Design a protein with these regions (language model features):
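Glycine-enriched catalytic-core subsegment of oxygenase/oxidase enzymes
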Residues: 3-5, 10, 14-206
Length: 206
């Protein structure tokens, strides 16, 4: 799931918090299947991101295979949907679906009514929901980059795949993003760039 859905589910925090690459990733896997080089279908993957300019460090957890985070009483909810995302801040918590869609601030009824009456100003360009092709065409017509251009999408995917490596080996990984190296596990580092067959090499810089 992490290698597939995270590019949808984690797009919001990755972009909004300017996460970049994690320096540490650890996967807790109740029933690892590493002997067959498979990824178990149940795990919790914990990513640690350092400070970014004036933004503080961030801890991110990815739950899959039935694993769920504990529910806090102040959220006022009884359970979670099948998939989704929580952004837990110092003051409030945002909950979305897995895409992530249908965002909801977990507030009391009074706070929610006040928020609806006095919403923050829209300072960020909006993209019509579930219309990425429209955004792509508009970007070409107006000579600008779409939100999910290759420069952005490649980093989002890299973050996810480092997590997948931790899942695959039920391991703790220390990641040097600048050099794209796993510094504490040479055996896992070998999987970042596997040798290409003759005639299929794509070079070092895409």
């Amino acid at each position: 799931q992490l290698g597939d859905w995270s590019c949808h589910t984690l797009d919001g925090p990755f972009w909004g918090l300017d996460l970049g690459m994690p320096h540490t990733v650890e996967a807790t896997v109740p029933n690892p299947r590493t002997q067959h080089h498979f990824i178990a279908d149940e795990s919790v993957t914990h990513m640690q991101f350092g400070a970014r300019g004036n933004k503080p460090p961030v801890s991110l957890k990815w739950y899959e295979g039935g694993e769920k985070p504990p529910i806090r009483p102040e959220w006022g909810i009884k359970g979670f949907k099948r998939s989704g995302m929580l952004m837990i801040g110092d003051k409030k918590t945002l909950m979305t679906g897995g895409r992530p869609n249908d965002p909801v601030l977990l507030l009391s009824d009074e706070e929610w009514k006040d928020f609806q009456k006095n919403p923050p100003k829209k300072t960020i360009p909006r993209v019509k929901e579930e219309a990425p092709v429209d955004e792509w065409i508009n970007a070409m017509k107006n000579n600008r980059l779409p939100g999910s251009h290759f420069g952005y999408a490649a980093e989002l995917t890299e973050m996810a795949l480092v997590g997948v490596l931790a899942q695959r080996f039920a391991a703790k990984i220390e990641y040097d993003a600048k050099n794209m190296k796993i510094t504490n596990r040479p055996d896992i580092d070998a999987y970042i760039k596997e040798p290409a067959r003759e005639g299929w090499s794509y070079g070092e810089s895409l």
